[in-house]
Regions:
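Catalytic-core regions of glycoside hydrolase
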Residues: 1-146
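Predominantly late transmembrane helices and immediately cytosolic-facing juxtamembrane segments
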Residues: 139, 144-176
Length: 176
């Protein structure tokens, strides 16, 4: 109860601030990889604060919450039902896909075939999606030029470019 009250008050104040600045229409409250029951509770809190907040989720596909999401990004290997994809397009909602450390292929790890990065856009186009989400751009481990691993994650999962304005073949092929 107290937790919900705090979030509703903060989000309502945030919405007011965004509207005063003219930024509300370009703001999206985003979450990643949350279970459906958590998302349902979260959406209730957000809607109490302001029913017009745009909400984004990168995670599994859940038909039950799909209509409430302005920007929906599902993991590769899952599919949007065709009628849902078409309705979302008609409603000007973003509909994308992503990869993360759990997909060995295709991906953009330091050991991935560079062609996999170029393939990402082709896949998005084939599926008639709005694009591809790469979860991290420059979240470097301690010594990214010497070791691309972060904890137990695959090498390069946490970044696509190197410090000091250095690009990499993975990034160059992704934007190709």
């Amino acid at each position: 109860q107290a937790y919900e009250e705090m979030w509703v008050a903060m989000l309502a104040s945030f919405a007011k601030h965004l509207k005063e600045k003219g930024w509300f229409d370009i703001c999206t409250i985003a979450m990643d990889e949350r279970p459906m029951d958590v998302m349902q509770k979260t959406l209730k809190v957000i809607r109490k604060a302001d029913p017009d907040f745009k909400v984004s989720l990168a995670g599994n596909y859940h038909a039950e919450i799909e209509p409430d999401l302005y920007d929906y990004c599902i993991v590769i290997g899952q599919n949007y039902p065709e009628d849902v994809r078409l309705r979302r397009k008609a409603e000007n909602k973003r509909t994308t896909y992503y990869t993360c450390c759990t997909e060995a292929h295709p991906n953009t790890f330091t050991f991935s075939d560079p062609a996999e990065a170029a393939w990402m856009s082709f896949y998005s186009s084939k599926k008639h999606l709005d694009g591809y989400l790469r979860w991290a751009y420059n979240s470097w481990p301690l010594e990214p030029l010497l070791d691309s691993r972060f904890r137990s994650w695959a090498g390069g999962d946490t970044y696509l470019v190197y410090p000091g304005a250095r690009s990499c073949i993975r990034f160059e092929r992704l934007i190709e």
